[in-house]
């Protein structure tokens, strides 16, 4: 049987069995539903999009997958080049993986090893946010702060190497004053904390984080697995405040295939580019850079560019603001719109 996510299988309701999907709609044998969650915020172009379908079909006729260990291929190379040209600053170096959680793990390994490669082994700490969610693997559980997901493993997910603070500039300044010489990175879901409760905060917090990271030589990591590709009204929050490492996932392939990217700037990359073998990043998911996933991602990005998605997002925002004004039911505590 299928072991379903985030469910007590003994008491869960029978899930809807989907037999078809098209556009915003999911179909069971006798029902048509709007997928308002976009399969956990990933299906940004709708289901069964002909452009992405064709990109995958064209690639599968050549090959579906070869590892990137000792081999390479055009779809992975083109996607890394596209992301480098699309992203701000010198975020040019793409490490691919097969899920957002793993991509955040890679970012945390990069940040820690960056300093270890320099001989600075005291920088073992991560500064993260209260109510953060960065994934379900053990290190991302440590960096996260959401008991709704990891309450049973709370004792094992806690770490002396992670400090959580509220999204307040005074708390940020105090944390740097106390820990700055032990921090390797500040890890945030920028502007919007998704799974932790759709909590929003001001970009001024990120600008201060960038300033303090520069002042004290700490890396700034943006987890834009959920917030990327227009979710905040910007293509990426990285367009507003430039991180040292950016993590992308979910919508990267238009929701077609699990794939993610950990994108580093030149400074971070050069911390690994060395004659010393031990300074290499020792991480390698089997399906990193999967050719079908990369082809889907390239088609998805092309759609995002050619169909003026940022204007579409502005129109959706305007409609949402207008319609949400009528939400006055006493059971509704707060309406949040970005």
Predicted features and spans:
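Conserved N-terminal phosphate-binding loop of PLP-dependent enzymes in the Aspartate aminotransferase
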Residues: 1-338
